Amino acid sequence: MIKLIKISIITFLILGFLNTSYSKENFFDEGLRLFQEKKYEDAKFLLERSIVFNPKHAKSYLYLAKIYKEEKDQKNEEKNLEATLLIDPSNEDAILMLMEIGIEKTNYSKVKELSERFTKVSKKLCNENKKILKD
């Protein structure tokens, strides 16, 4: 009888863990789908939940930044981009978006620093980099 109870408890713990693991990715995937459908408030909620379950998920921060960009909330956009780069220093999208913010703020020293970083990170998007520096 005691063995049966122990086995039942272990089974429930394992199933609970598997369910939690699945929900981490499910929040991000569902948030991404809503983002693509331009349902930003719902997407923001799910991406924030994704971060609660997995604080080191760089893509969740990146897509939150993209939502804040759509909402014209530059402070939160920049905060989430910085978080993205802390987790994934070679994230090309985050570097480019921060460069755009730096240009808007006329913070050219930061743009130059990010440009050098971007050049090291990316070969495939160098044309984007040259375009931004010309502007």
Regions found by a protein language model. Give the residues of each.
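Canonical positions in the second alpha-helix
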Residues: 50, 83-84, 117-118
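Canonical tetratricopeptide repeat
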Residues: 63, 97, 131-135
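Residue-level recognition of tetratricopeptide repeat
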Residues: 57, 91, 125-126
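Structural marker of alpha-solenoid helical repeat scaffolds
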Residues: 53, 87, 120-124
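Register position in tetratricopeptide repeats
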Residues: 36-37, 70-71, 104, 135
